[in-house]
Amino acid sequence: MGPQGPVGPQGEGVNWKIVDLNNVGSQSSPWDYSNYSDNNYYFAKFDVPALTNFVFTDGNVNGYILLTENGQTIQHSLPYVLHKYDKDASGNPIYYTETVDFVYGVGWVQIEVRDSDFAYEADEKIVPATMSFRIVMTY
């Protein structure tokens, strides 16, 4: 290997923007219900002006759910998949998976919560817990 070459010109650098979406599902930011006959889910849509056409086209957008474990806040990248257990009215076990994910477009982000049990009528009565999220845009 030869000697190191001269220092090059300074690069353009990286920009980033972090948007925290706190207490999604609370009274001030409630979940909406999709009410589709074949694929119901809960969602919350937010205006995110920093998510410009440039960020959408040439940048990167990552979503995280903020969780508390052992008294500390941690970030888990989306989608976040959680296997759950419940009982029906007769006491029989019900196993299902809850998936929390996000979709986005220019100027907005939508958080979605979907259960795999396909019990659409029941899902409308079982509202997801309040959750907090972080959206990180790099461009």
Report the location of each language-model feature:
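N-terminal segment immediately downstream of the Sec signal-peptide cleavage site
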Residues: 17-29
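Extracellular attachment/recognition segments
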Residues: 27-122
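Short, structured beta-strand segments at or near domain termini in extracellular proteins/domains
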Residues: 130-139
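Extracellular "spike/adhesin" assembly and maturation modules
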Residues: 125-129
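Compositionally biased, intrinsically disordered low-complexity segments
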Residues: 10, 21-22, 103
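Conserved beta-strand and immediately adjacent loop positions that scaffold enzyme active sites
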Residues: 3, 62, 134
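Collagen/collagen-like triple-helix recognition
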Residues: 1-17
